[in-house]
């Protein structure tokens, strides 16, 4: 998914069209310059639906498929109005690499957070305003 090449981060983001592409472009324009106290980095992504911060990179991909394990029994966390799913194996309290995905939004947004930036709450707080403004909530996280 991610490979560093000098200052540019290579990301495989999904190809999107229509409303999904418009919402994800709006999100990328609204994203902050820093996440978890890490500066934004340039991204090599053909379709333009990804962003990155820091080294090792925190990587955001917009318009991803629903993650495996996210079902009606999965737990989610709400931080500043945005619901997040983190696989149970990654949410035991130990610093591990985390892949967290928004819950209940019209487009799924996935953030890969290296263990260097554990716990994930700082990144969730930093990303919440842009997500709230641009990616429509269709179902609350419960």
What is each stretch, according to the model?
Residues 29, 36, 67, 116, ...:
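Residue-level marker of positions within ordered structural domains that often coincide
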Residues 5-9:
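Bacterial signal peptide processing site
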């Amino acid at each position: 998914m991610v490979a560093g090449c000098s200052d540019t981060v290579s990301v495989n983001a999904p190809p999107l069209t229509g409303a999904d592409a418009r919402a994800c472009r709006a999100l990328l324009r609204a994203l902050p310059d820093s996440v978890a106290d890490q500066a934004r980095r340039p991204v090599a992504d053909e379709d333009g639906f990804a962003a990155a911060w820091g080294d090792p990179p925190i990587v955001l991909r917009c318009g991803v498929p629903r993650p495996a394990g996210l079902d009606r029994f999965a737990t989610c966390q709400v931080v500043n109005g945005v619901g997040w799913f983190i696989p149970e194996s990654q949410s035991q309290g130990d610093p591990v690499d985390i892949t967290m995905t928004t819950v209940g939004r019209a487009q799924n947004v996935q953030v890969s957070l290296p263990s260097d930036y554990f716990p994930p709450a700082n990144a969730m707080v930093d990303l919440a305003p842009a997500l709230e403004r641009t990616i429509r909530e269709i179902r609350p996280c419960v």
